[in-house]
Amino acid sequence: MRKQRSPWTKKQQFIFGIIEIVVTLIASLTAILIVATKPYVDAEKKVIAIAESKADIKTVTEFDIYHGEATYYGLLGKSGQGEKLAVIVSHDSGEVDIYKQSDGISKSVAKKAAKAYGAKDISYVHLGKYGKTPIWEVKSGTQYYLVDFISGQVIKVEGL
């Protein structure tokens, strides 16, 4: 009786096994990433379409989701006439508020206002609404600084 030899050596089988595991991991992580970001991407597309129809937005420069007392989508962009606009859309009601960026403060001014109240390392700044007031939400550590978009005043500090 002859002993049949495997066409693959143990070393080759090991390398092939490692390659299979790596490819499976990469495919799995890619699928998870796509599924995890789908709600964000869908919301962004929906809000951009609303902004294009209601505010004549032609170029979008920024998109944010603000989760406060209610969820709002904030969008910065330029209209067909080149005017810089801020658009805030309510997740619940679909209400659309349109502001000229020149009528409000910039993101950097909102950061400065929050720093004046003690914010240190700022993680992000999102456009949203607090009640009827358009705001910038500035996150620093465990604190959230709500800065009035129009006046630049800090209207509320939340967090631990």
Regions found by a protein language model. Give the residues of each.
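Short, non-transmembrane alpha-helical segments in secretory-pathway proteins
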Residues: T30-F63, D97-Y130
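N-terminal Lys/Arg-rich, disordered targeting/topogenic segments
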Residues: M1-T9
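Hydrophobic membrane-insertion alpha-helices, especially the h-region
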Residues: I15-I32
